């Protein structure tokens, strides 16, 4: 790996964008008196889009610094000690177990693992993170507010939530594969983008629905890893 000033600048830019998103949503949420969980879910969805900047980096190490740094901040930053900081809605949940309230940390860890692991197929990483961000994030934000949900007989998950994971994840994956194709980092023909995205979203949907019991707090691992594996195989 060679030192790259351009990549360092990109790291700073993406950090700045992330904190701007978090700060803006925190400000709007407080003005509108939204719950911390609603703000957290909105951040989950909005920040996922930064993964689409992955093709702008020349080596996996530089984008790897982004989730690594955010994970360290979540663990040891000011929000780990008090609730009034900008990151607090991301870390501290309501009616969540301690493991589930650390969902954003798992979000960062799974992204940090995927970046070096699938760097040769970085569009897989982009699509998997988008499925996690848009699909799982939308389900968490919208599904609990649907009055007439059709719950599965296990785990407290709903059909409506699964549909949201699939539909928004499918849209996010298509966006990621399209960006990858335009950036010249995807080997998937345009005509196959829909089918590969479909399989990735389906894998994420099934993984999210199956994340019950002890696995329920860890859907930020099960969803992106399942999606990434199937899309990696489907795009080979």
How should each PLM-predicted stretch be described?
Residues 17-21:
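Glycine/aspartate-rich loop-and-adjacent alpha/beta segment that forms the canonical ThDP
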Residues 69-72:
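Selective transmembrane alpha-helices of multi-pass membrane proteins
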Residues 2-9, 23-64, 76-233:
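Interhelical loop and helix-boundary elements at the membrane-water interface
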């Amino acid at each position: 790996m060679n030192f790259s000033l351009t990549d360092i600048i990109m790291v700073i830019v993406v950090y700045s964008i992330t904190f701007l998103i978090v700060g803006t949503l925190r400000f709007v949420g407080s003005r509108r008196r939204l719950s911390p969980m609603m703000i957290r879910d909105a951040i989950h969805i909005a920040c996922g889009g930064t993964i689409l900047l992955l093709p702008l980096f020349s080596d996996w190490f530089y984008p790897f610094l982004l989730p690594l740094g955010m994970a360290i901040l979540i663990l040891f930053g000011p929000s780990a000690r008090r609730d009034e900081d900008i990151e607090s809605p991301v870390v501290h949940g309501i009616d969540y177990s301690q493991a589930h309230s650390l969902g954003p940390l798992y979000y960062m860890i799974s992204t940090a693992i995927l970046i070096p692991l699938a760097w040769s197929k970085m569009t897989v990483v982009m699509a998997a993170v988008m499925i996690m961000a848009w699909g799982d994030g939308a389900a968490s934000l919208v599904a609990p507010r649907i009055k007439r949900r059709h719950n599965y007989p296990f785990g407290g998950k709903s059909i409506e939530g699964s549909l949201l994971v699939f539909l928004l994840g499918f849209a996010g994956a298509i966006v990621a594969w399209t960006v990858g194709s335009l950036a010249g980092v995807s080997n998937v023909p345009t005509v196959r983008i829909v089918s590969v995205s479909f399989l990735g979203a389906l894998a994420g949907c099934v993984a999210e629905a199956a994340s019950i019991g002890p696995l329920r707090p860890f859907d930020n691992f099960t969803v992106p890893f399942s999606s990434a594996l199937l899309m990696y195989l489907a795009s080979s």
